[in-house]
């Protein structure tokens, strides 16, 4: 069974429809992100696209900022998931888990690639401990991503496999792999890292916000044929 797939950076109606038609499990929308990135949507524009997520797919708003701003945006848009990707602290993350759970909105939080950022957000640079802290806070998933606020607009950044494994081996909650995933390397990543979810943005687009059906088909085909490690 292949990992679940999250396609992020959706900006167009036709690309949301493509993802739903191809049975992508999670559709991601970068919305009111706190630093300039080419995929950023206004809350109003995201609100126009979210109702198009159907056929079993779930929606995810990727954002950052203060607890109050994120909470208000989530309650307004009502996605299935909110992904905290703007350097939010563990305390803010835990508060948002509690704030949003009654509305059925679950939280995904990044474990940043830099040790300095992990110390700032979690009080420790140890990636396994960061994962355990997030699990205790009640997040749906920890996202190990090559991107953070400092390089959010950079294309092709690749995740550190050792960082991903340190988090995955420390927790029972879902751990998502993001950063540099494309059809050419996803089989190797699945075989070596065994991610529960792959998070892909630039790996299926011809330019920012323009997804390619051919690239998505190639990614899905590679995922289906990948050999995951035995249980």
PLM region spans:
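C-terminal helical cap(s) of enzyme catalytic domains, especially alpha/beta-barrels
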Residues: 42-44, 49-50, 94-100, 201-231
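Generic hydrophobic/aromatic pocket-lining and core-packing "Φ" positions
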Residues: 16, 46, 70-71, 131, ...
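Conserved beta-strand positions in the central sheet of alpha/beta enzyme cores
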Residues: 6-9, 26-29, 81-83, 143, ...
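Basic, often amphipathic N-terminal segments
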Residues: 1-54
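Structural motif
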Residues: 22-24, 76-77, 136-137, 192-193
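A C-terminal functional module that forms or caps the active site or interfaces directly
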Residues: 170-191, 205
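Conserved anion-binding
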Residues: 30-35, 50-62, 68-75, 79-172
